[in-house]
């Protein structure tokens, strides 16, 4: 059964994984070598901007009893563990290693969105539509990062 608490919990988890995705790509940017990998710099900046937009679209629905749930303790901490691991593991690796870690993070994001979609049958259709739209864009990002990783030397 749909409740505003259910919606806020699902949205909160997505916002957390999105925040970690932003942090992961920010760290990945910092680990790229100066003067090289301009394509990755541009791509990672685009994904940071994309994810910021995702959160902007989700934030209005992350409310329980008039209070935003976007700050504080995660409702489901396991959802964003992979991005946290990514942030810890990036330390000046080469292009392929950075892409491998980014793909691992994208896997975590993909799982979080899949879980949200599975839990969403009772959610309002406009919220489900937003979640599905994000999931499609996130999957495209995942696949692109995977393809770049596979092509890296």
Located regions from the model:
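Short, charged, low-complexity loops and linkers
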Residues: 1-9, 36, 60-66, 88-96
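Alpha-helical scaffold segments that form or flank carboxylate-/histidine-based iron centers
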Residues: 6-16, 36-56, 98-102, 126-137
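Conserved alpha-helical segments that form or flank metal/cofactor-binding pockets of metalloenzymes
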Residues: 38-76, 145-148
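Acidic/histidine-rich alpha-helical segments that form the ligand environment
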Residues: 10-32, 80-126, 130
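Residues at alpha-helix boundaries and short interhelical turns
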Residues: 19, 48, 52, 66-69, ...
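Small-residue-biased structural context
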Residues: 5, 30, 49, 63, ...
């Amino acid at each position: 059964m749909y409740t505003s608490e259910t919606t806020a919990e699902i949205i909160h988890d997505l916002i957390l994984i999105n925040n970690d995705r932003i942090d992961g790509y920010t760290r990945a940017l910092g680990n790229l070598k100066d003067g090289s990998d301009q394509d990755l710099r541009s791509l990672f900046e685009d994904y940071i901007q994309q994810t910021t937009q995702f959160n902007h679209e989700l934030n209005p629905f992350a409310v329980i009893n008039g209070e935003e749930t976007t700050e504080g303790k995660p409702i489901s901490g396991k959802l964003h563990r992979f991005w946290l691991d990514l942030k810890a593991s990036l330390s000046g690796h080469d292009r392929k290693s950075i892409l491998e870690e980014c793909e691992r993070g994208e896997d975590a994001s993909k799982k979080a969105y899949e879980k949200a979609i599975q839990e969403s049958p009772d959610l309002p259709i406009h919220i489900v539509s937003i979640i599905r739209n994000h999931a499609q864009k996130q999957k495209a990002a995942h696949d692109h990062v995977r393809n770049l990783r596979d092509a890296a030397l």
